Amino acid sequence: MLHTLHRSPWLTDFAALLRLLSEGDELLLLQDGVTAAVDGNRYLESLRNAPIKVYALNEDLIARGLTGQISNDIIPIDYTDFVRLTVKHSGQMAW
């Protein structure tokens, strides 16, 4: 399943998101959700320990001035890659 986090993790039920992640799922951070990718924030460690790949939409990182601040564990992607993720996963959950 593809999970998309478009809101700040501080304004989301992040614990519920983590509970619903399964091995093989993927998480895309976009819009204000990209703040979860900033190195050193409290949500990043939970994402590192999850059995998933975590991506961040590069355009949203650039728009928020965060490109130099994200963790190396987060994979920046563009809109073409976003489309590939949606095609790959038949189910999607938006947060």
UniProtKB/Swiss-Prot annotation:
Top-level taxon in the UniProt lineage: Bacteria
Annotated InterPro entries: DsrEFH-like, Sulphur_relay_TusB, Sulphur_relay_TusB/DsrH
SUPFAM superfamilies per the UniProt record, alphabetical: DsrEFH-like
Q: Cellular location of this protein? A: Cytoplasm
Q: Which Gene Ontology cellular component terms are annotated?
A: sulfurtransferase complex
Residues passing through the membrane, by range: none
Q: Which GO terms describe its biological process?
A: tRNA wobble position uridine thiolation
Assigned keywords, A-Z: Cytoplasm, tRNA processing
Task: Tell me how this protein assembles.
Answer: Heterohexamer, formed by a dimer of trimers. The hexameric TusBCD complex contains 2 copies each of TusB, TusC and TusD. The TusBCD complex interacts with TusE.
Q: What does this protein do?
A: Part of a sulfur-relay system required for 2-thiolation of 5-methylaminomethyl-2-thiouridine (mnm(5)s(2)U) at tRNA wobble positions.
Q: Which family does it belong to?
A: Belongs to the DsrH/TusB family.
Q: Specify the protein name.
A: Protein TusB
Its taxonomic path starts at:
Bacteria, Pseudomonadati, Pseudomonadota, Gammaproteobacteria, Enterobacterales
Q: Which gene encodes it?
A: tusB
